[in-house]
């Protein structure tokens, strides 16, 4: 951990945003942020103290009464303006993502696009939070419902999508009338301040959106503070469990999205060219650092060899290099530590007896500066191998061969994670049965990464999601609002005198 004095000078300092402005932290701890393609330090980020987080919560709490009473059309107009400003600065934001995360520019731009779609969805908030009304439910009695904000909300987001995942959260939270505190990943924090600046430019009042940088100190302060009413989290399963158990024990509404091991099933009748293209893009795009990356391939019957015949040349042709070169298809991993962790899984897969078909440790790119690994492919893995069971979060595909379609469903359903899955087939009956019987939250049919669009909702099953509500879409609206039902009777309905029973027909 760097000293505070080092944060001033040669590298950019990334701090907190509270009550409409960048504020000085009371912390003496800073973390280094690296350009993952070169290994050079490009910024330092403050590790917020409990006092820093307390100030952000206080600002959000103070801003809540006025913002929650702001007409919904005015809140929607802030979202419309935010959309316009993000589109204006899109290239700059993509470069921020690529420098700190490493993904190639066109992938970074795609991340921005998917986040923008949630902003567009939030622009329709006047319609999305409409309640229901029934007149004359009893004599002179009407009943109606309304959706009101939860209060101060917080989002804790991962390194792999520094732009998109925060946009899964704060546009809907703010549009619903809540105030919001964002705790981004300390590995690539710069986008968080960009969102704060653009929201302020869009007309959002001070205190409605706040940013606290940091590590577990900031996270635990958020989870334990009674002024926060709801917490959204995306990250690994162990941390998701901690977030869910701690925050819910403190009376908060929680959606905590955890880990994944996403399978792609290849049936014998599949178009092998398309299946191979899908595996290269979904397995190695963003260096496999996606919660919806395909990391396990399940080949059914005799499909393995025809698939490999198409897949291996495509892996060999994959262009790996710096993300700032838009001709590249895969960039580096986020940090040296994470690269080494992924490399250790390749070592482990060999030790466990899986057949190493493509070894990313030997790729020419690994001789370059930065945190690079080449694409890796294991074949003949089994369900008892850790390289299959665990989330590697890197450019490693693991192939399991099964005899039948039913075996493929069984293998996937037996896995502890249930985030996303896909099947490639020309058989409509098989596709329909797969979609109905697979125990996974998001399913693709001839679509390798079935991330729902903004007007649906994103969420897995089993140990991939903790909490009852998925993220964004109508599930997001429900998460960031509380339902209130009003039963009313006006004086003309009570002229008969005292009533000692519930009003009804």
Q: Language-model segments: what does each one mean?
A:
Residues 238-382, 411, 445, 492-496, ...:
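ALDH superfamily catalytic-core signature
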Residues 38-44, 204, 228, 265, ...:
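Conserved C-terminal structural/oligomerization subdomain of aldehyde/semialdehyde dehydrogenase
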Residues 40-129, 140:
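Glycine-rich loop-to-alpha-helix module at the N-terminal edge of alpha/beta enzyme cores
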Residues 39, 75, 97, 119, ...:
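Residue-level signal for inorganic ion chemistry
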Residues 81, 140-142, 360-366:
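Short, solvent-exposed loop/turn elements at beta->coil junctions and helix N-caps
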Residues 1-37:
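Hydrophobic face of amphipathic alpha-helices that form TPR/SEL1-like repeat modules
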Residues 131-274, 327, 402, 467:
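Rossmann-like NAD(P) dinucleotide-binding subdomain of oxidoreductase/dehydrogenase enzymes
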Residues 64, 68, 83-86, 90, ...:
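Structural signal for hydrophobic packing residues in well-ordered secondary-structure cores
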């Amino acid at each position: 951990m760097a000293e505070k004095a080092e944060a001033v000078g040669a590298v950019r300092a990334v701090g907190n945003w509270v009550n409409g402005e960048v504020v000085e932290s009371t912390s003496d701890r800073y973390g280094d942020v690296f350009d993952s393609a070169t290994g050079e330090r490009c910024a330092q980020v403050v590790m917020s103290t409990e006092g820093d987080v307390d100030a952000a919560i206080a600002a959000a709490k103070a801003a809540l009464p006025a913002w929650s009473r702001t007409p919904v059309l005015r809140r929607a107009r802030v979202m419309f303006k935010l959309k316009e400003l993000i589109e204006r600065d899109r290239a700059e934001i993509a470069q921020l993502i690529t420098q700190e995360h490493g993904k190639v520019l066109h992938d970074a731009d795609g991340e921005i696009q998917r986040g923008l779609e949630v902003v567009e969805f939030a622009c329709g908030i006047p319609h999305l939070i409409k309640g229901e009304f029934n007149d004359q439910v009893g004599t002179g009695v009407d009943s109606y419902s309304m959706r009101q904000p939860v209060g101060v909300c917080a989002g804790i987001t991962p390194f792999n999508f520094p732009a998109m995942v925060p946009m899964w959260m704060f546009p809907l939270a703010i549009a619903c009338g809540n105030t919001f505190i964002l705790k981004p990943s300390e590995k690539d924090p710069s986008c968080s301040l960009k969102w704060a600046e653009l929201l302020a430019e869009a007309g959002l009042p001070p205190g409605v959106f706040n940013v606290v940088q940091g590590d577990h100190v900031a996270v635990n302060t958020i989870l334990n503070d009674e002024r926060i009413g709801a917490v959204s989290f995306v990250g690994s399963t162990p941390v998701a469990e901690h977030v869910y158990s701690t925050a819910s024990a403190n009376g908060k509404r929680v959606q905590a999205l955890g880990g994944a091991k996403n399978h792609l099933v290849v049936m014998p009748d599949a178009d092998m060219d398309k299946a191979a293209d899908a595996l290269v893009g979904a397995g190695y795009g963003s260096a496999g650092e996606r919660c919806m990356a395909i990391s396990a391939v399940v080949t059914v019957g005799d499909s393995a060899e025809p698939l490999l015949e198409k897949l291996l040349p495509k892996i060999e042709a994959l262009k790996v290099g710096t993300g700032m070169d838009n001709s590249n298809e895969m960039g580096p991993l986020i940090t040296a530590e994470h690269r080494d962790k992924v490399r250790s899984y390749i070592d482990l897969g060999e030790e466990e007896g899986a057949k190493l078909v493509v070894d990313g440790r030997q790729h020419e790119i690994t001789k370059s500066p930065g945190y690079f690994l080449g694409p890796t492919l294991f074949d003949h893995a089994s369900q008892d191998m850790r390289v299959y069971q665990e989330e590697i979060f890197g450019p490693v595909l693991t192939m399991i061969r099964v005899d039948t379609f039913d075996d493929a469903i069984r293998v996937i359903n037996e896995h502890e994670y249930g985030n996303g899955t896909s099947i490639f087939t020309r058989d409509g009956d098989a596709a329909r049965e797969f979609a109905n019987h697979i125990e996974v939250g998001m399913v693709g049919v001839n679509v390798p990464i079935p991330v729902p669009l903004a007007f649906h909702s994103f969420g897995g099953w089993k140990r991939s999601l903790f909490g009852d509500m998925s993220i964004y879409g109508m599930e997001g609206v429900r998460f960031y609002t509380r339902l209130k039902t009003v039963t009313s009777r006006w004086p003309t309905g009570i002229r008969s005198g005292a009533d000692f029973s519930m009003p009804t027909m």
